[in-house]
UniProtKB/Swiss-Prot annotation:
GO terms for biological process: electron transport chain. Belongs to the NqrDE/RnfAE family. Keywords: Cell inner membrane, Cell membrane, Electron transport, Membrane, Translocase, Transmembrane, Transmembrane helix, Transport. One of its GO terms (cellular component) is plasma membrane. Its EC number is 7.-.-.-. The lineage of its organism: Bacteria, Pseudomonadati, Pseudomonadota, Gammaproteobacteria, Alteromonadales. It is a multi-pass membrane protein. Part of a membrane-bound complex that couples electron transfer with translocation of ions across the membrane. This is Ion-translocating oxidoreductase complex subunit A.
Length: 192
């Protein structure tokens, strides 16, 4: 049990996919200007990342490895991710049309989010079992969501702040992201 808790904590805080591995930067910078859309993107990404991680493990274990098709791993994982994203988009469109409009192009772009594919491939490379794959996917999603929501809240405050003209917009966003990354480096010694 403690092994799973350590995996979760290390994935969320120590090895955060956005701030440490630099995966998922497109939605991190693109959807983080408003807190409402960041929360919606976080929920959608959490669902997609967790489910894609589980399904990718199953595809790898029960289709690719038994039939010696490991050379199709990346392509099959992208296909799994695309199916999960389409399912998620249909659910979001049916349940919350306003959230679907707010997320706009970023919801279908979860398919090309390198963090989602990165989690699936790292599960294979690190030889995680089924439960570890699910926890790793969920932890990566929680870490992504945590960083996205915190960054979005900071960007909303910065929009109202008196920022010097050369630093307005993307420049102050990059500085803020760098400072967040430094703050998360403080968790480095937490888990080995």
């Amino acid at each position: 049990m403690s092994e799973y808790l350590l995996l979760l904590i290390s994935t969320v805080l120590v090895n955060n996919f956005v701030l440490v591995k630099f995966l998922g930067l497109c939605p991190f910078m693109g959807v983080s200007s408003k807190l409402e859309s960041a929360i919606g993107m976080s929920m959608a990404t959490t669902f997609v990342l967790t489910l894609a991680s589980i399904l990718s493990y199953l595809v790898n274990q029960y289709l690719l490895l038994p039939f010696d098709l490991s050379y199709l791993r990346t392509m099959s994982f992208i296909l799994v991710i695309a199916v999960v994203v389409q399912f998620t988009e249909m659910v979001v469109q049916k349940t919350s049309a306003s959230l679907h409009r707010a997320l706009g192009i970023y919801l279908p772009l979860i398919t090309t989010n390198c963090a989602v594919l990165g989690v699936a491939l790292l599960n294979v490379n690190e030889k995680h079992d089924f439960i570890q794959s699910a926890i790793y996917g969920f932890g990566a999603a929680v870490g992504f969501s945590l960083v996205l929501i915190l960054f979005s809240a900071m960007r909303e405050r910065l929009a109202a702040a008196d920022v010097p003209m050369p630093f307005k917009g993307g420049a102050i966003a990059m500085i803020t992201a760098g400072l967040m990354s430094l703050a998360f480096m403080g968790f480095t010694g937490l888990v080995k």
